[in-house]
Regions:
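Short aromatic/hydrophobic "clamp" motif used to bind/position activated sugar donors
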Residues: 85
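Glycine-rich, basic loop-to-helix element that forms the pyrophosphate-binding segment
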Residues: 63-80
Length: 307
C-alpha cells in the first residue's frame, strides 16, 4: 500500500468518446496497493465535442478551448495535488499492479521521469524509449526507399529508437520516452513549467524531456512493468502526417536545427521523386509529381507551423 508520502495524481487528457476513459478509470480504481485517499483521478476535457460526463470521485477540468495534448496535461497538472503525476493516454490497458509496481521500481529513482514498457494489442514493442530527434532520424523516415527497413534493427536505429533501453530487463536510462504513459514527480514537472503549449500534437513530450535533461532529471524505461496501448497500432493519415511534420519543425526551430531540417527534407523529397519515377515505370498508379508536391506542401506548412 502506498504511504502518505506517495500520493498519486493521474491525469488523463480527453477528446472524443468517453467509454475508453471510463474503462481506464475503472482499472485505476481496481489497482492493488493504492487506497482511494492516495489516488486522485483528473480528466482534462480538451473542449471535446462530446463532453466528458460528471463522474463520482473524478476531478474534471473543462478547458475553454482545444489546445492539444500538452495543454490538456498542463491544465490537469495545475489541478493536481499528488506527489507523483501519472499521465495516461485514454486508450491504455493497465494491469492491476501497475501503480504499485512503478512506485517500487522508482524507489531508486525518486526524481526521475519514467515509462513502463508499452506494447500494442499484438504484444509487439512500440519502441517507447528513443533518442532525441536529429535531422538524420527525421530524414531517414522521410526517405521512401528506406520504408522496407522499418521493422528491422537497422530501421529502428535509423529512426532513433533506443534499442538498448527497449530490450533491457531492468530500468534503463534513455533520452526520452513516448508520452502514452509517463510518471514524474509533480515538483519535477513544475520545475520546467510543464509542457510547451506551442505543440498542438506530437513532440511535446520530446521537448519536455529535453528540458528535463538540461536540468539533470533522468528519463527511465521500466521494462518489468508493461501496459497495452491501443492507439499505437493505427496507421498515420495524411492529416496526422502534417501534424507530425509541423510539430517536428516547431521542435527543430526551438532547438536550433530548423534550417537544416528544411533543407534535408526538401532534398529527400526530390530523391523520393527520382525513386518514384522508377516505380511509376512498373506501376502507373504511382504519380511522382503528385507525391513530390504533397511532400513539399507538408514542408511548407510545417515551416509555417500550420496544421
Amino acid at each position: 500500500m502506498t504511504s502518505s508520502a506517495e500520493t498519486i495524481s493521474v491525469i488523463i487528457p480527453f477528446y472524443g468518446e468517453p467509454a475508453p476513459v471510463l474503462d481506464l478509470i475503472a482499472s485505476l480504481r481496481a489497482q492493488r496497493g493504492v487506497t482511494p485517499e492516495n489516488l486522485e483521478i483528473i480528466v482534462s476535457d480538451d473542449r471535446s465535442p462530446i463532453p466528458f460526463p460528471d463522474t463520482e470521485g473524478v476531478s474534471i477540468v473543462r478547458r475553454e478551448r482545444n489546445g492539444g495534448f500538452g495543454s490538456a496535461v498542463n491544465s490537469g497538472a495545475a489541478r493536481a495535488r499528488g506527489d507523483w503525476l501519472i499521465i495516461l493516454n485514454s486508450d491504455l490497458e493497465l494491469g492491476e499492479n501497475f501503480i504499485s509496481s512503478m512506485l517500487t521500481a522508482l524507489a531508486a529513482y525518486p526524481q526521475a521521469l519514467a515509462s513502463p514498457q508499452v506494447v500494442g494489442p499484438d504484444g509487439k514493442h512500440q519502441w517507447v524509449a528513443r533518442k532525441f530527434p536529429t535531422v538524420g532520424h527525421i530524414a531517414w523516415e522521410w526517405f521512401t526507399p528506406l520504408a522496407r527497413f522499418k521493422p528491422t534493427r537497422l530501421g529502428h536505429r535509423g529512426a532513433g529508437h533506443d534499442i538498448s533501453a527497449c530490450t533491457a530487463v531492468r530500468p534503463h536510462g534513455t533520452d526520452w520516452v513516448m508520452g502514452a504513459c509517463m510518471m514524474v514527480p509533480r515538483t519535477v514537472y513544475e520545475r520546467v513549467q510543464g509542457m510547451d503549449e506551442r505543440f498542438n500534437i506530437n513532440s511535446e513530450e520530446v521537448d519536455f524531456q529535453r528540458r528535463l535533461a538540461d536540468i539533470g532529471v533522468p528519463r527511465i524505461l521500466v521494462p518489468q512493468v508493461t501496459v497495452t496501448h491501443e492507439g499505437g497500432a493505427s496507421s498515420p493519415s495524411a492529416r496526422r502526417r502534417q501534424w507530425l511534420t509541423t510539430a517536428r519543425f516547431i521542435y527543430a526551430e526551438k532547438w536550433g536545427f530548423e534550417k537544416n531540417l528544411r533543407r534535408a527534407l526538401t532534398l529527400t523529397s526530390y530523391a523520393n521523386y527520382g525513386f518514384n519515377l522508377v516505380r511509376s515505370l512498373r506501376n502507373h498508379r504511382v504519380n511522382p509529381r503528385e507525391i513530390l508536391n504533397h511532400e513539399l506542401e507538408l514542408i511548407r506548412r510545417g515551416t509555417r507551423h500550420e496544421n
